[in-house]
Amino acid sequence: MNVLKKYKSPSESATLKTEVVCPNDTNPMGRLQGGKLVEWMDIAAAVCAQTHSEKICVTASINQVDFIDSACVGDIITIHAVITRVFNSSMEISVESFARKVLSGKKYLISRDRRAHV
């Protein structure tokens, strides 16, 4: 029997995660800790991968993480994860993180990376 695999477009599994930077998430300089941001990015990427594959997925590798700017207590962080390539048993996911200042509404890119999930 010939069974066709269901095709999913990247937009169907794109994931948006939102967090608020709290004092416990910051370093002694009052900036969001890089490790906390990478944790949030990993959760968004895992949800994206599992939504796309309809299976439990784990992070296989994280390529270069670029920390472009910082975020402070009270900033709203939005993390966008999207599938960029799919292979037989793995997929590549692009993750970008943005910060938004509550009072001014200014939104800016704070980090990005590419990662593989299996």
Task: Pin down the residues of each PLM region.
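Hot-dog-fold acyl-thioester-processing enzymes
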Residues: N2-V58, V118
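HotDog/MaoC-like acyl-thioester-processing domains
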Residues: L4-L16, C72-I76, T84-V118
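A contiguous binding-surface segment within folded domains or other stable secondary-structure elements
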Residues: W40, A44-R100
